[in-house]
Amino acid sequence: MKATGNFEACRNVDPMVALSDKTRAHIDHWLAKFPADRKRSAVLQGLHAAQEQNEGWLSDELIAAVAKYLDLPPVWAYEVATFYSMFETEKVGRNNVAFCTNISCWLNGAEDLVAHAEKKLGCRLGESTADGRIFLKREEECLAACCGAPMVVINGHYHEKLTPEKVDELLDGLK
């Protein structure tokens, strides 16, 4: 399954059905922070909430539902979903693990930690574990935590100053 940006089949999506109460409440919370004529300012948060609702990825239907809820053309929301690396447009493992491999992390051993995680999980960057528990995201160029290098983001939470033992502990703790 993969979001394709073909919204013809989603033309009649009802955001009140496709989006959970929790997702709509999250979007409404963010809409309240912006002027009424700036609904598109909440698209990032809307997509985040929809992705969380859908166990870590965005389908065409959810992208279209967020867009309709915000009175936007679906392609606008799709462009955001496919531009930012924080969004997944195909089904992936339940837990999203992203190692930073930029210069600070690389100089502090990120390459070895990625190899360690790949061996431990039995999958490579860009793949999910066979049981669907973990998605080892493609390399992240920079996650803006150079002072804590090497680091990883797991389900949106930063973990810094990693060692192989700490990586094991983090990965073993994911359900």
Cite the ranges covered by each PLM segment:
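Signature of N-terminal electron-transfer/Fe-S-associated modules in redox systems
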Residues: 1-175
